[in-house]
Structure formats: structure tokens, C-alpha cells
Amino acid sequence: MAQAEIETLRAQAAAGEIVLAYVDEAGFSQVHPNRSAWTPTGERHLIEAKRGKRLNVLAAMISNGELFSANFWETTTAAAFSGFLSLLQEHVAGPITVILDNASIHKAKAEREFIEYLKKQGVTLYFLPPYSPELNRIERLWHKMKHTWMAPKCRDAKVLEIDIGEILSNFGSKYTFSF
């Protein structure tokens, strides 16, 4: 049912009736995640986990092909998310439907009043069914960034910011994918 509703929203966006945005947040660690390892038979498998600082990105993949994003080193909070929605609404200047998951920061009680205000400004939130990341197209961006476009290496904070910025600012030209 959600897939059919999203197809209807996509048709409305294609007709220029609404702006559609797939919104999500992702965190990027200074140390690339270790996805596999080899351990001899009979030995205990141990890998020391190092993370370093984490750069968080809130982003919207907009139906016009644009990527709108904000990066920050702090924890992603409900207030940060509400602020991002406000900036997104100002950026698109028109009715916008936001497709997003059910993360607690998206539904925080402390931000309900502000979310109601945004609704009056033309922002509609469309919450996906639980456990259906395949319906949020921006999830594909995070996967590509983490596992294809970013080389598996350790980075200091500045290099991590530069690498993330390079991808986000060149999305749609140098960095692309199709559905």
C-alpha cells in the first residue's frame, strides 16, 4: 500500500503539483567500518573497534534532482531535525511532501507544535511503514557513499568533512545512481 501511495506522490511531483523529498540522516565515522575479516580456525575472532569523531548528515533528495543537506558534528536531535525541515521548506518555497522513516527524532513530542506550524506552511510528512528502508530513496545514497564512493581509509575530521562535502556538492553530476 505504501509503495502505491508513494507512486501517486511521485506522479504529483512529476506534474508539478508538489515537491517530493526523501529525507533521512546518516552518520559517517572517521574510521571506515570493517565489513569482514579472516581468523584461523580455532582462534578467537577479535577486532579492536575504533570510531573517532562522527560527522552526521541530514539530507533531502528532492524530486527536481537536487540534494539539500546539512552536516554537523553534534548528535542529531529532534530540534536539529525540525530546523532542517524549516530550512528545506524555505529552500523549495512551495508545498512539499517529505517521505521519512519513523525515527524517534522525527516524532518527538517536544517538536510537535513546530511540526504543526510547518504543516500550515505546506509541509506534509509521509511516514513509511516500520522496517521499510527500501521505500526511502535516500537510503541508496547513504549506501553508495559508505560502500562505493568513499575509499575505505582512516580520516581525520577535516578530511572526513572534505570527502563528504565533495560527494554531497557533486551529487547529480560526478556522483549519480539510478533506480
Language-model-derived ranges and their functions:
Residues M1-F179:
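Short functional hotspots at interaction and active-site rims
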